[in-house]
Structure formats: C-alpha cells, structure tokens
Amino acid sequence: MDRRKRMQIIILLAMVVTMLVGCGKIDKTSETKENKEESLHTENVVPAYVNELIGIEKFDEKIDYSDSDNWMFLPEDISKPVDTIYLYPSAYGISGEVEDDIADIDDVNMRLMAIYYASSQASIFEESTNLYVPYYRQFTVNSLVDMIEESPESLQYIASRDIYSMLDYYFENCNDGRPFILAGHSQGSVWLTVVLEDYMEEHPEYYERMVAAYVIGYSVTDEYLERNPHLNFAKTSDDTGVIVSYNTEGPGNSEAYNCVVKEGAISINPLNWKLDDSYATNGVVDAKIDTKRGVVICTSMENTPEMKKALSEYFGEESLHLYDYSLYSKELQKNVADRINKYMKDNEE
C-alpha cells in the first residue's frame, strides 16, 4: 500500500473515530488551580503565569522525538530537495471538554483532530516537499488566548519544551543540509512566531536555508518585525527567506474582536501576492487586503448561523479563520513551488 493511500485511510479513520468520540469528556484525573501541587520548576526558571496553568508539570518530561510515534509524518523516503515542517492548529479541546490546560502528547482526540487538519492544510506542501509533521502538546484555545494577552513572555518558555526539542532533533538527524519551509496555522503559527524570533536568531546556520515561513492564521505585526530585524515579510510571489502571513475575514468582521488579529497586523494577498488593497479573484473566491485592520477580506462565502455562533466569542461571526488555507489552497500550492524554484535558482552552485 503506498503512502498516499495509507494517509487517506488514516484520515478516514480519524474522522470516523472523532465522530464516535463526539463530545465525551476525556477520562483522566486532573488537578485544579487551587490544589495543584507545585511544579518541579521554580518561578526563578519559568514565568509565574506558567505555573498557574493546569497540567504544566507535563513539561517536566521531555518528549523523545527520536520515537516515530511522536510524529504524524516522519518520512523515510526523501525524494525532494526541500522539507516542510508543519505545526497543526488548535486540536486539543475541540472535540470535547477537557480538564487540563495542556494536552498529553498522546491525547487521542488531539491527535485525531490534528490528522484531520493536516489532511487539508499540510497536504498543500506535500507535492513540492518532504513533509514532517510532529505531534506537540497543545493548549486549549482559551488558555492560549489568555496567555498571549496576559503573559506573552511565557510563549518562549512553552515553545522551548516541545517545539525546540523537535527542531533540534530534526536539524541534527533528519534535515541533512536541505532547504526547508516552516508552515503552521492558528496555534501552530503562534509557535512559529516564537521560533522565528528566538530559535532562528540563535541558529543562523539553519535560518539561512529557510525558503519561507507560512505563518497563516495568526498576526505578524509591524512591531514584531521592528524588534526582529533578522526577519523579513514577503513582498512578492517568489521572494525567499520571508514570512508569508494573512488572516481571512468577511467584510462584516471589521469591528469584531478576533483573537488572532493584532494591532499593526500585516497580510499578503494570497491571490495576487501584493500588500496593497488591490482586489483579486480567481473566479471562485476573491481577496482584498483591509490595510487598516491588516487582514484579507473575502466576500465569496458566508458562515452558517451555527458557525457564526461558534466563532463569535474568539474570532467574530464573519471570521473565515477555519478556511484560511482551503479558500486559497491551489494558489498556496503553486506559491510553495514558485518560492522553492526561486530559492534553488538563487542558490545554484
């Protein structure tokens, strides 16, 4: 059975089991913030905010990324000259109630939802690259949003647990000097902003081989770029070593609270790859940058009443956050190939 057929079967099983699991509560013993035992870490080592998270002691155990069970995809057949590392969006606490703020690495529901997301998002990179998809311990949406807003300095500590360990393993054992792409969505893109700011600055020998970073579904801001002069935002369809980022909304979301849209956000139009407010369409969906809000406006689809209700608290009723990738999947797939071709041409020996 070839790899693509295996992937299709895994995805089908994931969707079926997710429906069977439904909204059942994960059966595990959990601490509360009031009676939680003190973390093995001290406040001198980690931000005080982190020690208030339910389940933070899980990070006292390091994930072994030499174990293939901690990867959704860990390719053995390296058939392409470029790799992609993809970090999936929020998958923990999506299909049912959970008690901890932080997932276990082998949380069944998280893994099933992660596979479901990867089937539509990570597959965009599979045609042009060797695809690496690690499992990592996620936060619930509400706990991550609270941490970003109340203690953004905690993000670096959290990323240094699983994400940095995974990157260390990948670069030391898997990469073999190949160019690479970083890709994520939503929570995955949150961690990519930390990786780009911190890990890549500490590892310029890796960063110089980065074709692009697709930080989609979370804001890259002017302030972020100003404090990180080693980073550059994409300006064209094929510049390399750059960040590609956007958030998609309907026109009625302009005044709504959206947890992934930050002040000073920048978006690139995924149809014409411009930063201005020029209108573009591929005949099916459209895109235009709201340069004031820093988002892509799409008028080609509308959320159902049920979806509007589900999105209203954290994203706004007309957020198209769930469709950031799927709306422009063909354009993204071509763009990946275009940037790779430009990188390879620029780096010919």
Task: For each feature predicted by the language model, list its residue ranges.
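C-terminal motif of bacterial Sec signal peptides marking the signal peptidase cleavage site
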Residues: M19-G22
